[in-house]
């Protein structure tokens, strides 16, 4: 008896999950744009403060690349989670809680996707 009530309550709760911050996708997109603008404005300060061996343009291009990596996400809760993580990274960078090496990890060469078929794995040297 009690088991069916619990099952019904969990099934009802799982269908109506409240988003973290954004009520809909438009609000989530607005939060992403705000975060992008904050990172875009912070790049010149970061390059100067950490004395990075990159230009401001390269830094801004990397910021764009990092944001475009998650452009396919459509769930507002996941977008909110990514925005929260981005804000934490931004705060750590602004307050110099990171060291130069932590910041430069973002600027390693973009990794090529791993091969998926047998011949590509064989040519690269990965195990099948």
UniProtKB/Swiss-Prot annotation:
GO terms for cellular component: mitochondrial inner membrane; mitochondrial membrane; mitochondrion; respiratory chain complex I. The modification Phosphoserine is found at residue 11. It is a peripheral membrane protein. GO terms for biological process: aerobic respiration; mitochondrial electron transport, NADH to ubiquinone; mitochondrial respiratory chain complex I assembly; proton motive force-driven mitochondrial ATP synthesis. Keywords: Disease variant, Electron transport, Membrane, Mitochondrion, Mitochondrion inner membrane, Phosphoprotein, Primary mitochondrial disease, Respiratory chain, Transport. Its main location: mitochondrion. It comes from the Eukaryota. GO terms for molecular function: NADH dehydrogenase (ubiquinone) activity. It is found in: Mitochondrion inner membrane. PANTHER family: NADH DEHYDROGENASE [UBIQUINONE] 1 ALPHA SUBCOMPLEX SUBUNIT 6, NADH-UBIQUINONE OXIDOREDUCTASE B14 SUBUNIT. Accessory subunit of the mitochondrial membrane respiratory chain NADH dehydrogenase (Complex I), that is believed to be not involved in catalysis. Required for proper complex I assembly. Complex I functions in the transfer of electrons from NADH to the respiratory chain. The immediate electron acceptor for the enzyme is believed to be ubiquinone. Belongs to the complex I LYR family. Mammalian complex I is composed of 45 different subunits. It is linked to Mitochondrial complex I deficiency, nuclear type 33: A form of mitochondrial complex I deficiency, the most common biochemical signature of mitochondrial disorders, a group of highly heterogeneous conditions characterized by defective oxidative phosphorylation, which collectively affects 1 in 5-10000 live births. Clinical disorders have variable severity, ranging from lethal neonatal disease to adult-onset neurodegenerative disorders. This is NADH dehydrogenase [ubiquinone] 1 alpha subcomplex subunit 6. The gene is NDUFA6.
């Amino acid at each position: 008896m009690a088991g069916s009530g619990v099952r019904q309550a969990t099934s009802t709760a799982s269908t109506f999950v409240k988003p973290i911050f954004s009520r809909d996708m438009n609000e989530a997109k607005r939060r992403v744009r705000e975060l992008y603008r904050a990172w875009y404005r912070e790049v010149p300060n970061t390059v100067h403060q950490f004395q990075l061996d990159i230009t401001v343009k390269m830094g801004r291009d990397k910021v764009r690349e990092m944001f475009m990596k998650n452009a396919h996400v459509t769930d507002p809760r996941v977008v909110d989670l990514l925005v929260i993580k981005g804000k934490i990274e931004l705060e750590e960078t602004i307050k110099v809680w990171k060291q130069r090496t932590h910041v430069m990890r973002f600027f390693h060469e973009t990794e090529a996707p791993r091969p998926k078929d047998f011949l590509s794995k064989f040519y690269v040297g990965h195990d099948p």
